Amino acid sequence: MTKLKMLSMLTVMIASLFIFSSQALAVQYFTVSTSSGAPVNMRSGPGTNYPIMLSIPSGSRVPYYCYAYGTTVTGKYGTSNIWDQIQWKDSRGVVNIGYVSDTYVYTGSDGPVGYKCN
């Protein structure tokens, strides 16, 4: 194989790594809300058995990362055992990553959206 051909193949492989890794890093934003306007609880894991980390004001737009299965909850958008991993920056500027029931997150879908959390 010639050096030029080898260099061309290597260039294509490196370029494809950048294309696919940038797609994997794309973050979606969704709105969390309750029917009553009460805050939404963010938990340390995907279920009501996990501790509440903080409460997010209803109507807030949050970065969404992935989903996991956990406790079944009934909320504004139905009944589901899907929990969404999201991010929230609290009043002190501390960034928190935790889980909110999908029944309080408007994703536009009744099923899982995006990637399953590891």
UniProtKB/Swiss-Prot annotation:
Membrane-spanning parts: none
Domain (SH3b): residue spans on this chain: 30-104
InterPro entries (UniProt xref): SH3-like_bac-type
Keyword vocabulary terms for this entry: Signal
Signal peptide: 1-26
Taxonomy, superkingdom: Bacteria
Recorded family membership: To B.subtilis YraI.
Protein name in the entry: Uncharacterized protein YraJ
Organism whose genome encodes this protein: Bacillus subtilis (strain 168)
